[in-house]
A protein has these predicted regions:
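N-terminal Rossmann NAD(P)H-binding glycine-rich loop of SDR-like oxidoreductase domains
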Residues: 10, 14-19
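Rossmann-fold cofactor-recognition segment
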Residues: 33-50, 55, 71-72
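Hydrophobic structural elements of the Rossmann-like NAD(P)H-binding subdomain
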Residues: 67, 110-112, 191-194, 204, ...
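Conserved NAD(P)H cofactor-binding loop of Rossmann-fold oxidoreductase domains
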Residues: 67-74, 259
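Catalytic loop of short-chain dehydrogenase/reductase
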Residues: 72-76, 102-186, 198-199
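C-terminal helical subdomain
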Residues: 92, 163-165, 169-172, 193, ...
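Short C-terminal tail/terminal secondary-structure segment
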Residues: 250-275
Length: 275
């Protein structure tokens, strides 16, 4: 069995992923703000470096997998922090741990995006470019300015919805771009993303008010299966992507959303290559 890092391991999808991986016999190095093997704040450069350093020490410099699950939701009032935590945090961590992954016989990495990247019509293309360009200071400044320009009623209801959806889209694009580079693909480090939908976690309840007693048919987006997801539904796919047998899948974005994206964008995938 392998050594696998799981960020956001103290609650929600991260906790479910860590539990499933431990049950499968893996050694899990959890990363979170509390109750984890590595306690670090991935929202800033210092915390990210602390996390990388401690993970490398605990793992002996060899990792078989990384599951970047940690993130914050659209109800967070600081849009700049959302950009840092949801995009720059996982990207910096994965880049910092790439060398340790390369030393494994079957290295795997998976990150958590969101179906909000394709179902929320508030993507900030400028912010996407700044994120993919790696300019965190400019991205934070832009996210804060864009948030202040939103209608007050929207800021009150979901203060960082645009920054949230945009950060998750940029993260999915980073995965697809990065997975096929020689530094990842030709080194055998497989990198994929999961795009969850309405999953009953503290993050979703805090963002939407939906809990286990909430009627799925009253949710703002379509719920074709008539149920909400559970953290364990995401943990299942995290484990699948990290398995050594998953040897021919990289650069994928898997929607685990009960059919929401398919209901809203039935012809969006696959997209034909234009001549």
């Amino acid at each position: 069995m392998g050594t696998i890092v799981v960020t956001g391991s103290a609650s929600g999808m991260g906790a479910a992923s860590a539990e499933r991986l431990r049950a499968a016999g893996h050694r899990v190095i959890g990363v979170d703000l509390r109750s984890a093997e590595v306690v670090a704040d991935l929202g800033g450069a210092e915390g990210r470096q602390t996390a990388v350093d401690e993970i490398l020490e605990l793992s002996g410099g060899v990792l078989d997998g990384v599951a970047a699950v940690a993130g914050v939701g659209p109800n967070m009032r600081d849009a700049a922090a959302v950009a840092s935590i949801n995009y720059f945090g996982p990207v910096a961590l994965l880049n910092g741990l790439r060398g340790a992954l390369e030393r494994s016989d079957a290295p795997r990495a998976v990150v958590i995006s969101s179906n909000s990247a394709s179902t929320v019509p508030m993507i900030d293309e400028t912010l996407v470019e700044l994120m993919l360009g790696g300019d965190e200071d400019a991205a934070r400044e832009h996210a804060a300015a864009a948030q202040s320009a939103l209608p007050p009623r929207l800021i009150e209801a979901s203060p960082s919805i645009s920054a949230y959806a945009t950060s998750k889209l940029a993260l999915a694009h980073w995965v697809r771009r990065t997975a096929v580079t020689p530094e990842w693909g030709r080194k055998g480090i497989l990198l994929n993303a999961i795009a969850p939908g309405a999953v009953l976690t503290p993050l979703m309840t805090g963002s939407t008010g939906a809990d286990k007693d909430f009627d799925p048919d009253s949710f703002p987006t379509p719920m074709p299966l008539g149920i909400f997801g559970e953290p364990e539904d995401i943990g299942f796919w995290v484990e699948q992507f990290l398995r050594p047998e998953a040897r021919f899948t990289t650069g994928a974005v898997l929607y685990v959303d009960g059919g929401t994206d398919a209901a809203m964008r039935p012809t969006a995938q696959p997209t034909a290559l234009r001549r």
